[in-house]
Amino acid sequence: MTRPILIKNAEVFAPEKLGRRDIFIAGGRIVAMEESLEGLSVPGLETIDACGAIVTPGLIDQHIHVTGGGGEGGWKSRCPELVFSELVKAGVTSFLGVSGTDSMSRSIENLLAKVRGLKQEGASGWMWTSNYSYPVTTITDSVKTELFAIPEVLGVKIALGDHRCSFPSMEEVRSIVADVRVAGMLTGKTGFVHVHLGDYTSSFDIFDGIVASGLPIKHIRPTHVARHPAVFERAMGFAKQGGWIDITTGGGNYMGCAADAYDMAVENGVPVNRITMSSDGHGSMPRFNEAGEMVGLGVGSIMCNIETVQELARRHDLTTALLPMTRTVAEALTLEGKGVIEVGADADLLILNAEHEITDVFMGGVQCMRAGEVIVKGAFEE
């Protein structure tokens, strides 16, 4: 049972600016929010005075290699696993775990176990089954069964247009989308195909063919959309047709940073409610030469999410900055109670200072960071 908490005098961005509010959280949810909850009497109530501070929804990151990505540079290039305190420090209260290039030593069973472990430690977590390989890699040997039987699975990941993918045909990808759609109908999950994009625009030819055949565009979710000029041009067109596109905050955007990609998309007519962002955290950040040979490798951080929020807030306003990693992604993935501050929503909250730096984090009503210090850590963290 979580301890009831009253956050007073906060400037609330829900993500829309609401002004000064008191927020009462109990049982992991937001129970009340008013201009003043003075006089509230609840046994065991803890009161936090947030005067001068900002309260926002926790961030949602739909693309973290929680078991570690990488491997493209040989045995020593396998990226390390994520630990719980990294989520806390980055203000990521909800995440989707994902696998990548390595379909040999990174099993989907291990991914599921890691997601469930992070959930036990306090975060909200889901996952994409499979990886870059085709045929898809699943626990149950069926995409439909995967969504039907495993609550954490919201869809399947594939890779297209990348020299590391299996180059499935349009018909093969369409079959995956069809299976995901049916499974989504049966489970109420919607069902998505989360698509790692490489540098080749052929991916969007496949998407166009699938949509033309009658399958709804909402099931196709491309990520890393700003990695190449031609790919981004096609991605913007895809979004203007009603699709969602996901910009990577952790780098790999040809025009600069994720905020640059966001601005370019909006300037080119992409609706803001069709743009999400994710970190690609703990994935490898390989650098290849023109011959396709890897010449360098790094590990993606999830701190790039809050850094992107800060940059977008400098350019625009805090509501604009928060949307791609709060309300928009929650609505895109049909995550009820996530990405918003309203009565009945999950108590996943951040307290920010005037510079939009994270000082306090709440996951499901549990305070995990206080005054910049992580106070709830993972099972094996000191």
Question: Across the structure, where does each feature detected by a protein language model lie?
Answer:
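Histidine-rich, glycine-flanked metal-binding segment
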Residues: M1-I5, E11-T56
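Divalent metal-coordination and catalytic microenvironments
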Residues: A10, G28, G52, H63, ...
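C-terminal cap of metal-dependent C-N hydrolases
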Residues: A10, I30, E331, I341-E382
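Short amphipathic alpha-helices and their capping/turn segments at secondary-structure boundaries
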Residues: P43-C51, S142-L147, A258-P271
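Metal-associated gating/positioning segment near the N- to mid-region
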Residues: L45, A50-A113
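Divalent metal-dependent hydrolysis catalytic cores, especially in the metallo-beta-lactamase
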Residues: L82-P135, I150-S166, M185-D199, K218-T223
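Active-site core of metal-dependent hydrolases
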Residues: R164, E172, D179-F288, M294-V299
